[in-house]
Swiss-Prot record:
Record has Cytoplasm as a keyword: yes
Gene name linked to the record: prfA
SMART domains attached to this UniProt entry: PCRF
Protein's UniProt keywords contain Protein biosynthesis: yes
Lineage: Bacteria, Pseudomonadati, Pseudomonadota, Alphaproteobacteria, Hyphomicrobiales
NCBIfam families, alphabetized: prfA, PRK00591.1
Protein name in the entry: Peptide chain release factor 1
Function comment: Peptide chain release factor 1 directs the termination of translation in response to the peptide chain termination codons UAG and UAA.
Disulfide bonds listed in the record: none
SUPFAM superfamilies to which the protein is assigned, alphabetical: Release factor (SSF75620)
Amino acid sequence: MTPIPSDRLDAILARHEFVTAQLADGSADAESIVQLSRELSELDGVVAAIRHYRAAEANLAGIRALIDEPGGDPEMRALAAEEKPEAEEALEQAHRALQLMLLPKDAADEKSAILEIRAGTGGDEAALFAGDLFRMYAKYAESKGWRVEVISESEGTVGGYREVVAEVKGRSVFSRLKFESGAHRVQRVPDTETQGRIHTSAATVAVLPEAEEVDIAINEADLKIDTMRAQGAGGQHVNKTESAIRITHMPTGVVVFVQEERSQHKNRARAMALLRSKLFDAERTAKDSARAADRKAQVGSGDRSERIRTYNFPQGRVTDHRINLTLYKLEEVMAGPALDEVIDALVTEHQAELLAAEGMA
């Protein structure tokens, strides 16, 4: 086990004591109370882990002292020797739990998310695959009790989507879906294939934390806002009013388009929320890319050009290339809930990378 510096743990305990005293004092203003309460709720879990770790440390030290005591009671020494493996295991578990609690937190993890799926190479088959991916994430969200709301969609000519953008609302959505960003590849025999040949198609997935107004400031003077009639499949107009909204953020060139609502006002609000999330994500990505380059991270880099996963239908196989994980349960993964097995493995690998970067591996 890599030792955890005692002075670091003492500093956390001291901060917890200080914040508790500040809240008990009652002299802080309302805004400070909110911030202190939030900090205290985060510290409570870490402090409990520190105390558990130190209790496990003390217990093992006591057992070792009994075993090593010269002239000690043989019966007590034998009993201590029996208890030692269990005490060592308990300390190792407490050490691991505390290490994870001490890892740098991603402030966006608690947020809802924006999910974007775009068909890539492969024509109609790519659009169908994009639709399959969207249904997989929708079913996964349902299994978690999250809510999915489509912001914009462009359907494929034979089904699926050329592009679909949706909000996934719920607690800690981003913490689970953030590793899905990247290029997804499918290998299967299309329904239209008469020779039984396997085709390869692709779709790209982007997952952004849903930003709030406090997360990023947008100057209205930087926006170019266009209104137009909403369009359906094939480009035909589906209503006579100009309810669709396209917003361009001039300094960055980021463009968002929303037409799902019949009301122009509602579409504008949704477009602004989407723009906010895109700009917030761009800021985060720039910072994360620098950190990822420093630690040569394989997971969580958020590189959307990277091929991250292959879905091979003839073999019933899902392979995540970042961690060399292969599961022969493609149907279960596409059905939603079994996606947890892939995400859990990615989270574990990401934590290992963070531990190494922090010198705690």
